[in-house]
């Protein structure tokens, strides 16, 4: 599709690739495509904090222009809520730094000439700052990240062993080029083949004290996007 867009004169500005469930994408290949077709590469790394790609824990900013983290309570580490953006691009860093705090500019030459007290807002920004308590919690969690990920992998091994003889279930793929962070362990089921209804399965599992979830309903199926 990138080649097709190029042929008709359309430019792709950015591509977002998701390390879904904790499994890193093929980032080296994606990086080569971004160079070839001149687009920004964004790594949605929210599920894969603690994963490694080709034995590199810091693979995110090595291959992508922007890496996004989520520190929601169910993620591999948490600050209670919130997240972060990682980048090695100074221009992107400066832009994000402004956007996170109402786009208040205290550092430009124009502002400095007005006096040390002066600041300016040139466009709409946001209130996306983590507070000190959230940061302290995040730092304490970060120190235990390796243990958290190891525990998730141990649990995943138990699931794999339990379902190893169930050919009607498709388990998460473990690529040989990466180490999985197992934010999720999605099991895919062919409901037509198994002759099981999804709602019946969910209700039965709930009776057993196990809450299942669908991860995720595709964005294009939500009315907000449909109405666009």
Residue ranges of predicted features:
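Active-site phosphate-binding strand-loop segment of PLP-dependent enzymes
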Residues: 1-79, 84-91
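PLP-dependent aminotransferase class I/II
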Residues: 3-10, 14-18, 23-29, 36, ...
């Amino acid at each position: 599709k990138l080649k097709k867009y190029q042929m008709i004169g359309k430019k792709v500005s950015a591509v977002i690739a998701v390390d879904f469930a904790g499994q890193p994408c093929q980032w080296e290949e994606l990086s080569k495509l971004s160079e070839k077709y001149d687009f920004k590469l964004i790594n949605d790394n929210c599920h894969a904090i603690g994963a490694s790609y080709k034995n590199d824990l810091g693979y995110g900013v090595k291959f992508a222009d922007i890496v996004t983290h989520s520190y929601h309570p169910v993620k591999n580490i948490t600050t209670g809520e919130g997240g972060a953006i990682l980048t090695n691009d100074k221009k992107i860093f400066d832009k994000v730094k402004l956007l996170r705090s109402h786009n208040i500019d205290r550092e430009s030459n124009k502002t400095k000439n007005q006096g040390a007290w002066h600041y300016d807002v040139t466009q709409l920004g946001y209130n996306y700052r983590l507070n000190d308590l959230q940061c302290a919690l995040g730092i304490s969690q970060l120190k235990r990240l390796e243990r958290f990920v190891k525990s998730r992998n141990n649990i995943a091994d138990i699931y794999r062993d339990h379902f190893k003889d169930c050919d009607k279930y498709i388990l998460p793929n473990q690529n040989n080029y990466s180490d999985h962070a197992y934010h999720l362990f999605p099991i895919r089921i062919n409901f037509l083949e198994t002759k099981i209804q999804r709602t019946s399965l969910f209700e039965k599992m709930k009776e057993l004290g196990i809450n299942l979830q669908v991860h995720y309903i595709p964005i294009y199926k939500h009315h907000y996007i449909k109405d666009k």
